[in-house]
Amino acid sequence: MYKSLFFFLKIFAILILLGCSVTAYIIYHYSHDLPDYSQLVRYYPPSVTRIYSRDGKLMEEYAFERRVFVPINNVPSSLIESFIAAEDKNFYNHPGIDLLGIVRAAFLNISNYLHNRRMEGASTITQQVVKNFLLTNEVSLERKIKEVIISYMISRVFTKHQILELYLNQTFFGRGAYGVAAAAQNYFNKSIEELTIAESAFIAALPKAPSELNPDKNYSRVKARRDYVIERMFEDGYITRDTMKEAIGSPIVLRKRAKEETVTADYYAAQVREEVIKMLNSKEEFYRGGLTIITSLDAQMQKLAENALRKGLREFDRRHGFRKPIANIPLDHWQEALKNIPTPSSLLEYKLAVVLDVSDNHAKIGLIDGSKARIPIIEMQWARSNLKSVKTLLKKGDVIVVEPIKDCYALRQIPEINGAIMVMNPHTGQVLASVGGYDFSTSKFDRVTQALRQPGSLTKTFVYLAALENGVKPNQIFNDGPIEIMQGPGMPSWRPKNYEGQFLGEMTMRTGFEKSRNLITVRVATAVGLTKIVDIIKRFGINNEPKKVYSMVLGSIETTLSRITNAYAIIANGGKKVEPHFIELIKDRNGKIIYRRDNRECFSCNILDSDLDTAILEIPKEDIYRVTDEASDYQITSFLTGAIDSGTGYAARKLGKIIAGKTGTSNDSKDTWFIGFTPKIVVGSYVGYDTPKELGKKATGSNVVLPIFIDFMNHAYKDEPSLPFKVPDSIKLIAVDRITGKMIPDGTVIEAFKVNNIQMLENDYMIDNHDIFIPGISDQSQEIY
């Protein structure tokens, strides 16, 4: 008996020795090519870069992996306990691998196999860190052995808190969320500090199968997994029985970011992205760096600008009538057929519908959801002039675009025309709003900053400003008559004409500007000289290399909406240099400011993401550099207010504000513009086709773009007081006769004269410059074609 016992002990000892030898050999064999785990000390995870409006509303997120890094000290204990209960009960007690857990899982999996249930794993949190950071997801014995070895080694070097920090920030939780902070935001629109026990348990349940645990698709399975985690928290002593019952009894309610917490500004965000990438000289750092970018964007103005632009483009498009239905489908199983119609680009809030029946005064339509409605003929009148019957416009089976309005629908179509709008603070250069097109999802081409177009009459402002800078008086008389300009040897002569082809005779320079008379502008330009006009175009940043030709003065140069709006911003602020900017400051993932537009001390810049809604950025003290003198600047501002009061911008008078502005229409009406400003704001807008073509023979800045400006200002500034433009000391206001330009006490217009010209005016009471010599001009009596 003793011999048998001794034999078995001997065999057992040999087996133990053999097992230890094999284990030692395996460890020795696989330890030679293990990945370097020291890199975990320098953990620098890809994090989300977020762009915010000036008032803290989230505009956009950019990332390769949507992650917000959170130090372990900032993670609530209840969230940590949820993960310990769900993933690794003995985390704080084992050396990286849980031998008891492995044995328990082995016996449990035998039962699971016999009952056809899912197998349970025994990987610890440390092992998952190793797999996520250092190894692949390959299912092999070799990978598992390496995982165990490294897990043990890591546990001897890293603290449990360090391992948890790696795990909680690296793990994927579904819906594009990496790390617990991103998961809390994506699923519950909360910070991790705000999570309830039930919500913490839900997040802790996700790593097992993040793609499958979707409450929208499999609520009961997700809730069962969450409740299992809650029960484990109770069993492990983290929560009380009452807390467990309350948490299990709560439903899973997912929450998206509230609309009031975000702002849609796709073109603006894309511009910011490009600028920051250029600033950092690294696309990688932008997408991985976890930057916080605060912009100049005003969320309310952005929304109003977008609405005004879309409304203006749609109204222009409707004035040109209904093109045609998208398709025609059979009415048998019409709902399925309608679902199979490809969704048109830029549908936005519009809907697809199919015409089910038509009568003289309405159309019956069906929508994708199976509901039915009607379109009265009054909501189709725009489609065709003198529309008498719907039957002449639509037929059964026609697929059309509609818009819900009150208790019915209206016929609509997606505009082919496009445009842009930009809003600036003229004193700081802050871009308060920028909409680069009708729909970013369809066209990412930014018509604010990228589209080079001819500004038409917008250039005239700077021709007149050049004249005022060089001493030409605002009541100078010029002749609105035929003119021919000899452009030099070998060059054809140039015979400009007015928009409508008529001549109005002699008038003051002011009246010529207000009425946007081409021939007056050409005469003013010839009096000043092209050299000075080229200089002012470059000085105001409209075009860096304008061609020195006379057609330039009528807007044949190319510029962007951003450049020309900024040029008018310089006028609006009194002639001081300003540059449009989108970005106020940038912070890295640790909250350190790496860029600030203004270098002065900013006491409210050291803020966390959660504090952004209360952050106030100081208005910067700009480097003052004069682009033009304040007297000439006020004179041209006076002209621009006149263009609103009695010129091409007359329609804007309905706003009841003191506004300066100028319309612009290029040759053949291919590009239309309006830029208007007050002492506080400048708004530029443009409308045209991406492939330039005529908008219509009667299309002008006045009837195409000005309505967009009016709509925006009517909503954005309706409650703002009407502020006058400041009159500088170098200007004296004198009443003159609008027609003759003579100074008379009861003059019909108040003219702005430079103080150093007053004596000259008093000595020359009758201002008459009819016979002023302008070299290079030959007046023609015949009509110009």
Swiss-Prot record:
Its EC number is 2.4.99.28, 3.4.16.4. Its main location: membrane. Disulfide bonds: none annotated. Pathway: Cell wall biogenesis; peptidoglycan biosynthesis. The active site is at 87 (proton donor), 457 (acyl-ester intermediate). Residues 398-711 are annotated as: Transpeptidase. InterPro entries: Beta-lactam/transpept-like, Glyco_trans_51, Glycosyltr_51/Transpeptidase, Lysozyme-like_dom_sf, PBP_transglycosylase, PCB_OB, PCN-bd_Tpept. Residues 1-6 are cytoplasmic. One of its GO terms (molecular function) is penicillin binding. It is found in: Cell inner membrane. It is a single-pass type II membrane protein. It comes from the Bacteria. Residues 28-785 are periplasmic. Residues 49-220 are annotated as: Transglycosylase. GO terms for biological process: cell wall organization; peptidoglycan biosynthetic process; proteolysis; regulation of cell shape; response to antibiotic. The chain crosses the membrane at residues 7-27. It catalyses: [GlcNAc-(1->4)-Mur2Ac(oyl-L-Ala-gamma-D-Glu-L-Lys-D-Ala-D-Ala)](n)-di-trans,octa-cis-undecaprenyl diphosphate + beta-D-GlcNAc-(1->4)-Mur2Ac(oyl-L-Ala-gamma-D-Glu-L-Lys-D-Ala-D-Ala)-di-trans,octa-cis-undecaprenyl diphosphate = [GlcNAc-(1->4)-Mur2Ac(oyl-L-Ala-gamma-D-Glu-L-Lys-D-Ala-D-Ala)](n+1)-di-trans,octa-cis-undecaprenyl diphosphate + di-trans,octa-cis-undecaprenyl diphosphate + H(+); Preferential cleavage: (Ac)2-L-Lys-D-Ala-|-D-Ala. Also transpeptidation of peptidyl-alanyl moieties that are N-acyl substituents of D-alanine. One of its GO terms (cellular component) is outer membrane-bounded periplasmic space. Keywords: Antibiotic resistance, Carboxypeptidase, Cell inner membrane, Cell membrane, Cell shape, Cell wall biogenesis/degradation, Glycosyltransferase, Hydrolase, Membrane, Multifunctional enzyme, Peptidoglycan synthesis, Protease, Signal-anchor, Transferase, Transmembrane, Transmembrane helix. Cell wall formation. Synthesis of cross-linked peptidoglycan from the lipid intermediates. The enzyme has a penicillin-insensitive transglycosylase N-terminal domain (formation of linear glycan strands) and a penicillin-sensitive transpeptidase C-terminal domain (cross-linking of the peptide subunits). In the N-terminal section; belongs to the glycosyltransferase 51 family. This is Penicillin-binding protein 1A. It comes from Rickettsia typhi (strain ATCC VR-144 / Wilmington). The lineage of its organism: Bacteria, Pseudomonadati, Pseudomonadota, Alphaproteobacteria, Rickettsiales. The gene is mrcA.
